[in-house]
Design a protein with these regions (language model features):
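N-terminal low-complexity, Pro/Thr/Ser-rich intrinsically disordered segments
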Residues: 30-63
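A small/polar (G/S/T-enriched), proline-flanked helix-loop surface module common
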Residues: 64, 68-199, 203, 236
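Short, well-ordered beta-strand elements
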Residues: 134-136, 210-223
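Surface-exposed amphipathic alpha-helical segments
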Residues: 219-244
Length: 244
């Protein structure tokens, strides 16, 4: 496999999480939901490529990789490899099926970008000394980052792929994002895997899905990411969208 695929495949480890805490914005702040109300201003369509966070949001010790650029580079070096990634993504399944978006893999995001290059942009932030990875994706099409709003259906998840299967348990994570229309956040624990590449049993990663100001974005953090680094990235992406 092309070496350029490695940063994107970190998304697989970073995105082994399940969402909870979902809500819609009301006319007043609601601390229980993680959403606070703000005036709605029509700023026009969201351009994911200009609103996704850049290297200025990287935590100390982290470097950034553009998944969109990586996809272009690897196709130039190995024509057809991106279509192979799309095919691989189609082989990954989840049970329950609606929870697939809550345990995405690197090829999941590559597939979405290859097929919808203008509608989604993604970045990886990696700390090579700790193997910690934060992954961020922003889309102008909410269907590309569709996710279940009720974590109860995703309490137990099994993800199957050509190399075997991986099982997880999910728990709600409290997360507040000012101005968001919807926040879904959770911690997911790896309980069993047929592949050592999936991580260690008992390892906990985090994921959030946020709908705000006409955009939908997701942030995921591998088990090595500190909780405060994960939260700061979620807030940084919200701020970037609000200020566009």
């Amino acid at each position: 496999m092309n070496r350029h695929i490695v940063p994107a495949l970190a998304l697989a480890a970073a995105c082994t999480t399940v969402g909870a805490c979902s809500t819609n914005q009301d006319t007043e702040d609601n601390p229980a939901t993680g959403v606070s109300a703000s005036p709605t201003v029509d700023k026009g369509p969201v351009d994911p490529h200009t609103t996704v966070v850049d290297d200025t949001a990287a935590p100390q010790g982290y470097s950034m990789d553009s998944i969109n650029q990586m996809i272009q580079d690897q196709e130039a070096e190995n024509p057809g490899i991106n279509q192979d990634m799309v095919s691989m993504a189609q082989e990954v399944t989840a049970d329950p099926a609606e929870c697939a978006a809550l345990t995405p893999t690197g090829v999941t995001y590559i597939s979405k970008i290859v097929q919808n290059p203008d509608a989604i942009a993604a970045r990886d932030f990696t700390n090579e000394s700790t193997d910690a990875t934060l992954s961020v994706a922003v889309s102008s099409d909410p269907q590309l980052l569709n996710h279940p709003r009720d974590v109860s259906v995703c309490e137990s998840i099994t993800r199957a792929h050509a190399g075997g299967s991986t099982s997880y348990t999910a728990a709600p994570m409290e997360l507040r994002v000012d101005g968001a229309d919807s926040v879904t956040a959770a911690e997911v624990t790896l309980t069993q895997s047929s592949s050592p590449l999936s991580g260690d049993n008992g390892s906990v990663s985090r994921i959030a899905y946020v709908e705000i100001d006409g955009a939908t974005y997701t942030v995921s953090g591998s088990p090595e990411v500190a909780p405060e680094e994960f939260t700061r990235m979620v807030q940084a992406q919200a701020e970037k969208i609000r200020q566009r």
